Amino acid sequence: MNVNLTHCSLVRNFDAKFRLHLAVCRLTWPMQRPWIGLLAAGALLAASRPPRNTQEAFDQAPTAAAVASSPIPRVERESPSDLELSGDLAGLAPGTIRYLTRDDLLTLPQVSYTVSDDANFTAPTQISGVLLEELNRRLAAAPESDMLVAICSDQYHANYPHAYVAEHHPLLVLKINGQSPAGWPKDPETHRDDMGPYLISHPKFSPAFKIFSQPDEAQIPWGVVRLEFRQEKMVLGAIAPRGPQAASELAQAGYRIAQQNCLRCHNLGQEGGMKAGHPWLVLSAWAAASPKYFADYVRNPQSRNPRAQMPGNPGYDDATIAALTAYFKTFSSSSQEQPGPQEKEKP
């Protein structure tokens, strides 16, 4: 029996995943096919074992062949539960819209966790679904530079820059306690609204930084209907501070806070959520014309408008408010006419 394994190799590729090269393995004895079958079965068994934790799920990320076998996004919506995709999708013109069904998403690698620190749940809860980094690798035109934006049915936005995804491993939830959305709990605020068709959670969230009294905050939207794959520099660059005070320490601190907090419900042009109904330049005008009004609005919106839906930030200290005020003021100039605090607010 002559065995030549000189061309049989385990190759470790650039993203730390092993691929077994069987096609170039020469086994020169009569039992060649059974050995190949055993090797292939072993590789399949190893690949099919579910990951035990987030890092293992990341290490089991798909090779090029696996990505090629990903479900093809559909041109038309087939069901209200389809996940809408847009932005910069691989192989498509920017802004193209496509859809993935729940069944499509369930064919992707699934991870499962029991979470105990998600404010959307009142008790430890089992969740399962697809990691956002998995979706980014498979669908984004430029996975290394794109960020994800989760858009909800009420125009709330949750933003996932590359650093956030790498640090916290957010998960697009497909099942809660083994149930599809029809069996999910209601929303945590009113206990009336459905939290489907999708929501986003984390295996465990530990803040990575703190700016004054604003910690790194978990982005846990529910009612997610759309994922956008966007160029991070373009999205965050749109709300970068402007003018001669842009580089000041306070303005830069306010910029980082606004990325995590304000951008979820307020917009500057096409960037940011539209749930609040108060665009960036309105906030800027308030900060410039009446810093006290602006501070009151940020800490306790209902003190200025009883119908306001925005949750308050009562824990913001004076330094945090000063940073946000300095940041938003960079968008105003004495020559611009902006609506002031006396303008009647939308609910």
What positions do the PLM features span?
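Bacterial N-terminal signal peptides
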Residues: 37-43
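Bacterial Sec-dependent signal peptides at the C-terminal "C-region" and cleavage site
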Residues: 45-64, 68
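Structured, non-membrane catalytic/scaffold regions adjacent to prosthetic-group chemistry
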Residues: 70-232
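Second-shell loop/turn segments in exported
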Residues: 115-123, 244, 281-285
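Electrostatic cytochrome c docking/interface patches
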Residues: 233-257
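Gly/Gly-Pro-rich "capping" loops immediately C-terminal to redox-active cysteine motifs
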Residues: 255, 263, 267-297
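Axial heme c-ligation environment in periplasmic c-type cytochrome domains
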Residues: 275-282, 299-331, 335-344
